Every structure is written in structure tokens, then in C-alpha cells.
Amino acid sequence: MEVKFYDTVNDKLLKFAVVISQSNGKWVFCKHKERDTYEVPGGHREAGEDIFETAKRELQEETGAIKFEIKPICVYSVTGKNRVNDTGEETFGLLCFAEITEFAKELHSEMEKVVLMDELPENWTYPLIQPKLIEKYLRVESNSIIGATVTVTVDRPLGSYHPEYKDMYYPIN
């Protein structure tokens, strides 16, 4: 199984959307009714559907998310036979990230439940694919803060020491 990442590909090639999700600082995973494993929300693009709409629809259907912010991360591809690809040919999908702030009270999909986790699961439905997608997301996110300008407010008077860390001095310029 080979997973690759691209900035973009022809839109017609995108057949899947996967949405790495968090809620209140926890990872969001789905457990399918017919499996004892966990997976990231995602699924097939329907005929004539915009791929970003696929991502939003799958997130809503599989997690019950009703309030969320979602953004595209990159395009990924998978080469090799798996549960959703019996030919093994390279297939492409859109990888997104969502921060979910509200869930519906009930799920109305093939998912048995949604689980919020502090750590990534050990028993994945797609163990050769989805951990790599999360690794890519984490790399992209860490790169987005490196070199960023951060503005802070010092809440101590200049020329004083921090009350807990006596070696931390706020100099007067």
C-alpha cells in the first residue's frame, strides 16, 4: 500500500474525501456498525458533487457534526488493493481538517458511534492509510506556525521579575 501527497490534481480524479477532525482538543473517530475498528470520517464522491461538498457531507453523515469549521489540507493518493479499491490502481482524494463544535444527538448512518480520543487509536479500519493522512496533517499544521509572527502582551510591569519564575526578568528597553 502506497500513500502519496500532492498540492493539486485534476478535479475529475478526486473520488474520495477524508476529514481529520477534532472537538475540544480531542481526535474524532467513527466506529462502523459492522467493524470493531476506528476510522477517520470520509467517503466516496457522488456523481456531480463538488469534492469539498463531499467532505462536508461525509463529516455530517458519519459524525453527526452540525457546527464545524472545515478546511482543505492537500490531495492524497493510495495505490494498492484495499477495502474500497479492488483493482489496486492509484486513487485520489481530498484530505481536509475540521474542528467540530456541535454534534447531533443521534447518528443516522452506517456508524455505530463517534468517539473522542486523546490519543490515536490502535485498531484502525485502514491502518496502512489513515495514520499516514494524520501524519501529513500534523506536518502541515506544524509548518504553518514556524516563522509566524506572534504578538504577546506582557502582563507584568517592565523592570520586574516574574512572581513564580524568579530568574525571568522583564527588562526595560
Predicted regions located by residue number:
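Acidic, metal-coordinating catalytic segment for phosphate/diphosphate chemistry
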Residues: 1-18
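A short catalytic or substrate-binding loop motif that flags glycine-/basic-rich loops and adjacent residues
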Residues: 10-14, 88-89, 146
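Short, surface-exposed beta-edge/turn micro-motifs
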Residues: 15-17, 24-27, 92-93
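A structural signal for short, well-ordered beta-strand segments
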Residues: 19, 72, 96-98, 150
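Conserved Nudix-box catalytic region and its N-terminal flanking loop in Nudix hydrolases
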Residues: 22-61
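Unchanged
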Residues: 45-69, 76-132
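Glycine-rich, aromatic-bearing surface loops/beta-hairpins
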Residues: 135-139
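Hydrophobic N-terminal alpha-helices or hydrophobic patches in metabolic proteins across all domains
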Residues: 142-173
